[in-house]
């Protein structure tokens, strides 16, 4: 039986604790998470740190329960600085892009940022694979940079989150193995089509893209 009170809630799903080892995530719109679960099973099968899938039933996904703060939470408490957060974020993304993909391209997460990384005792684990697909790795790099820039500019997140996002953007740009600018326009288009964006986030998309270009030129002058 599903608990009545969510353990956590996102923009389009709720997460319920089933026991100490498992959680159930339910999509509010009723869509099946089967495709997402297949990607998660693929990456964990190749040793990548993502929650292990136990079952898919309708709109419900049962998976491992993770214990620890998100990377953003660790930044907020001062346990991780922006440079280290950038290294962790870029490192996970580089590892993901190095995995074999069924279609021969790269596996993209397309929502990889510090609030989707859980800092467990065994190491960082990447969650929320809803947007995952195959494609060009630089699109994923551009999306992460764009999200961080948006958070720093949108004015919908309480202090000190915008400042941490700005510093985290520089940390990410310093450590990523990809090109954050080459496919940035494509990332802007995908982000603009996201129905879960707040109006304030949509309003700063162009400015966020400009911020990525500016910071990439400053942090990665040799590119």
State what each model feature region is.
Residues 41-42, 46-49, 72-115, 124:
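Conserved kinase catalytic-core helix
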Residues 43, 65, 147:
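Conserved catalytic core of Hanks-type protein kinase domains
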Residues 51-56:
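Conserved beta3 strand of the protein kinase N-lobe
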Residues 123-161:
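Active-site Asp-x-Gly
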């Amino acid at each position: 039986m599903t608990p009545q009170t969510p353990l956590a809630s996102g923009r389009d799903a709720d997460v319920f604790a089933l026991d100490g080892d498992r959680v159930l995530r339910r999509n509010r719109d009723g869509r099946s998470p089967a495709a997402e679960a297949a990607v998660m099973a693929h990456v964990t099968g190749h040793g990548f740190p993502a929650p292990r899938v136990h079952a898919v039933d309708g709109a419900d996904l049962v998976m491992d329960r993770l214990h620890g703060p998100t990377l953003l939470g660790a930044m907020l408490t001062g346990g991780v600085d922006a440079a280290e957060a950038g290294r962790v974020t870029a490192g996970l993304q580089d590892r993901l892009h190095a995995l074999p993909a069924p279609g021969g391209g790269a596996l993209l997460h397309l929502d990889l940022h510090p609030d989707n990384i859980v800092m467990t005792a065994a190491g960082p684990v990447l969650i929320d694979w809803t947007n995952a697909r195959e494609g060009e790795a630089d699109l994923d790099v551009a999306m992460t940079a764009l999200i961080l820039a948006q958070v720093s500019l949108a004015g919908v997140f309480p202090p000190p989150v915008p400042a941490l996002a700005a510093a985290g953007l520089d940390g990410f740009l310093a450590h990523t193995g990809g090109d954050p600018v080459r496919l940035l326009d494509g990332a802007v288009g995908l982000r603009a089509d996201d129905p879960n964006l707040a109006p304030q986030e949509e309003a700063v998309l162009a400015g966020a893209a400009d911020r990525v270009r500016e910071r990439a030129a400053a942090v990665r002058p040799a590119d």
